[in-house]
Amino acid sequence: MGFRKFSPFLALSILVLYQAGSLQAAPFRSALESSPDPATLSKEDARLLLAALVQDYVQMKASELKQEQETQGSSSAAQKRACNTATCVTHRLAGLLSRSGGMVKSNFVPTNVGSKAFGRRRRDLQA
């Protein structure tokens, strides 16, 4: 009973092995025979081959750099959005005044603007 299940598998495997033995793969060296051996290249041919390889590499890197700059330009435009609301303008003006220094700072009265401004009160200015 087990031999009947095993018999088709055995026949199929024998057929596959017979077909694999009768087929011959193409020789691997035949494809390489057409290209010249690097050891037999003249110095001029080797120099031209090296120049072509370097030129292709430089062109490939230049195209990659150009593509990278294009993708960075589009993504940075999406990341930096102009904020023209009153809160953003006020914060930008407060930052400008705090960075300006010198004479403006001596006459500058602190306002209730900035990251630490909310809920902060100064008692010395309320007099």
Curated annotation (Swiss-Prot):
Organism superkingdom: Eukaryota
Gene3D superfamilies: 6.10.250.2190
First-listed, main subcellular location of the protein, grouped into a coarse class: secreted
Any one GO cellular component localisation term in the record: extracellular space
UniProt keyword list: Amidation, Cleavage on pair of basic residues, Disulfide bond, Hormone, Secreted, Signal
Signal peptide: 1-25
Known tissue expression: Expressed in spinal cord, pituitary and thalamus.
InterPro entries xref list: Calcitonin-like, Calcitonin/adrenomedullin, Calcitonin_CS, Calcitonin_gene-rel_peptide, Calcitonin_peptide-like
Subcellular location: Secreted
Post-translational modification Phenylalanine amide, affected residues: F118
Disulfide bonds: C83-C88
GO biological process, one term: regulation of cytosolic calcium ion concentration
Propeptide residue intervals: 26-79, 124-127
GO molecular function, one term: calcitonin receptor binding
Keyword Disulfide bond included in the entry's annotation: yes
One Pfam family here: Calc_CGRP_IAPP
Function recorded in the entry: CALCB/CGRP2 is a peptide hormone that induces vasodilation mediated by the CALCRL-RAMP1 receptor complex. Dilates a variety of vessels including the coronary, cerebral and systemic vasculature. Its abundance in the CNS also points toward a neurotransmitter or neuromodulator role.
Family per record: Belongs to the calcitonin family.
The protein, known as: Calcitonin gene-related peptide 2
Organism for this UniProt entry: Homo sapiens (Human)
Organism phylogeny: Eukaryota, Metazoa, Chordata, Craniata, Vertebrata
